[in-house]
Amino acid sequence: MKKKVLAAVLVAAVSMSMAGCGSKQAESTDNGSKTESEAGSDAAAADSGEKKTLRVGMECAYAPYNWTQSDDSNGAVPISGSSDYAYGYDVMMAKHICDELGWDLEIVKMDWDSLPTSVSSGAIDCAIAGQSITAKRLESVDFTDPYYYASIVTLVKKDGPYKDAKGLADLKGATATSQINTVWYDTCLDQIEDVNKLPAYETTGTMLVSLESGACDLICTDQPTAMAACVAYPDMEMLDFSSAADNYQVSDEEINIGISVKKGNQELVDDINSVLEKMTKEDYEQMMNEAISVQPLSE
């Protein structure tokens, strides 16, 4: 879920940049399975005062939120069951949460679509994976407060036919796509008049390659993902219509990024929120900018 960026993200494609968000299918190095005895041991450890280990699931292929790299540079964390390491905004946030709460951290790499079921089954404690807090997801998992506030943007080629677009009306008739199971694909693209909507892509990397190769005119994504893409692909340009009335219409819940936990696990939600409430949007932006600045451009 690299040839060009987005460490793990763009790896699948050549290899990738943030709400909400998207869908991506990466090769799993750990199926995230936790036996009942292991789960019981975790609970016993917590009850006895032993240091808790937070098992965090993510795709490790969705830069700048998370990616895979071959060493521990910049503070990357080992991926469970693998010789590789994970880093990115999500890993930085997971480390910060565990540092504040005095917990150990374990990163579990898994396919994007398996995250909700892994959270629900208790195979992982939570998913910190760039997931937007949608009503559909809230049917199966609970969410913390947002740990990033994403905006939706459009990616085009600098020399493409829509490079001068100032709003959605200027995108009329465009051939467009995005990632599967995202608000970008399910909600936003249909707001473009006469859009030629291609099938959704499984990964961020393949989505970006479709634009780079000319298979589509534009893709819809979140701002961090687009920013990282522009680092990987200098011939791409991000169009932000947020200051115009003619913009994608979505709710805050659809683009705010949260940490998913098992339904009913209010204790974990409260613990994580106790860390997030001490942070500001400026803290999030600073952390995201750092992630974008160190994302691998090749692997």
Model region roles, listed by residue range:
Residues K34, G49-G130:
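Extracytoplasmic small-molecule ligand-binding "clamshell" domains
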Residues Y149-V156, A232-N273, V294-E299:
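Periplasmic-binding protein-like
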Residues C60-A63, S83-D99, Q131, V153-L208, ...:
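Bilobed "Venus flytrap"/periplasmic-binding protein-like clamshell domains
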Residues G22-Q25:
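Bacterial signal peptide processing site
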Residues S114, G130-S140, T187-D190, D217-E253:
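A ligand-binding cleft/hinge motif common to bilobed small-molecule-binding domains
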Residues D104-D170, D246-D252:
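Acidic, polar ligand-binding/catalytic clefts
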Residues M16-G20:
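C-terminal motif of bacterial Sec signal peptides marking the signal peptidase cleavage site
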Residues A45-A46, V183-Y201, M238, D270-E299:
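Ligand-binding clefts/hinges and TM-proximal coupling segments of bilobed small-molecule sensing domains
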